[in-house]
Amino acid sequence: ARLASDLDDYVVSLFRQAIAAGADQTEMYYWTQIEKNSAVAPRLVNELATYYKRKRNYDKAYLFYREFLQYHSEDVPALVSCAEMEMMRGKEKDALKTYEKVLMLDADNLQANIFLGNYYYLQAEKDKKKLEEDYKKITSPTRMQYARYRNGLSDVFTNSYGKAKTYLQRVLQVFPSMEAGNTLEKIKKMELELK
């Protein structure tokens, strides 16, 4: 077993060198020559994912992180990297789902909590702004229209701001982030205004 492990380490080292010498050929070698159910295959695909992430080729990095996750679907660092690639590819909704999966596995994951906290905060800001703009268009609002506006604001606070607050509070438990603290202060101030 020790010999096999040393041999796998050596194979991974050679594979890493091959990637540096020619990533396209090494990638082709992976797809056509590597036995996908071999013990070393996940390590090789992880090398390709890491290489493409470093080179900022987010599409290929994403592809290889997804491939790696076929082997280790609950690997938190790989899920976080996959979510980063989804963001870089403009797939916010996919990143959202991936970060939510990360938090199911590791509730204190800093990156996932920061992303989700900021995502829901920005979503809440956008929804609040739209409600305010729509309400301002009404020249003389009736009580019913005002009540609808207040209910809409209340929903935004309960849902999006509430979620943002939960995630950002977790961030502060793990890491003293000034930005998360400032955002929480803004949410608190708005909550007081709404009451």
Give names to the regions the model predicted:
Residues 2-4, 36-37, 71, 105, ...:
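Structural marker of alpha-solenoid helical repeat scaffolds
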Residues 26-27, 61, 95, 157, ...:
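Single-residue signature of alpha-solenoid repeat helices
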Residues 10, 44, 78, 112, ...:
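TPR alpha-solenoid repeat register
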